[in-house]
């Protein structure tokens, strides 16, 4: 069997050890004569899987007991609506940062429910960084403060937690479990699973109990109410059981790697060596302010964009898959989430060096 290095932005690479476990358990999970994909979501087998996954995630992120962890259907984009629906309460205003494609989409969705107030807009920097926090326009009152921790398309990542007294809401879809952080600084965190936690179709929400007491907007469907999901422990209806099971396996894998702090060091090394190569090159370029460069999604361009197709073709032939940049930006993008090995990054750097020698 020959596997490639998969640099896809999502669905993304899954640790091989996890895939081997899935393969071994797929037909007969723990000797019950069935796949975990076939069991009842209310049976003791899956309830055990679900509870263990939640315990492991709570341990990995040091989530306080004053927070609920929800395992919900749908992608992060659904949260663009669920957040204002559930958290606005009597407020007319919510604060947002426009840092790139995904925050911009969240702002557009929020306009259906409130008046999004822009604290700052990275567009003025051509989305190559975040304006200095001292320049942000921060109101004294608002329902919440929303930002995207890592912009997968633009290749921007926050190196700090914004300083605010407002309820902090964060989209961590592409970097949850990639570095330690203080959960207690946040009111609500959400992340889709297909970057660092497995399969598309599952989104994890970590929400403080106090926010569950806010009254949703009157038009909010019951199925989109956080409080109801919390009350039913994410079992209002049949949850995405296989995605939940796989996320649990990945949580075990993270623990076996030594935890989130160990992965953070590895992620920093991977990103640093790739950026170092790009910065030394006259053939490849990354436009992002080094302070805000993403550790998860490294975007780069070739000096001669006519060579883009050839670069992608030869990369694929050399076992380096899914390096094409997002359709909105073009160029290249190497997504190096937790599951990407250092060997994979080294292989990419080696190929880029050889390609530059041939065509630079």
From Swiss-Prot:
Major location (coarse): cytoplasm
GO-annotated molecular function: O-phospho-L-serine:2-oxoglutarate aminotransferase activity; pyridoxal phosphate binding
Subcellular location: Cytoplasm
Pfam families linked to this entry: Aminotran_5
Sites of N6-(pyridoxal phosphate)lysine modification: 195
Transmembrane segments: none
Protein name: Phosphoserine aminotransferase
Protein source organism: Coxiella burnetii (strain Dugway 5J108-111)
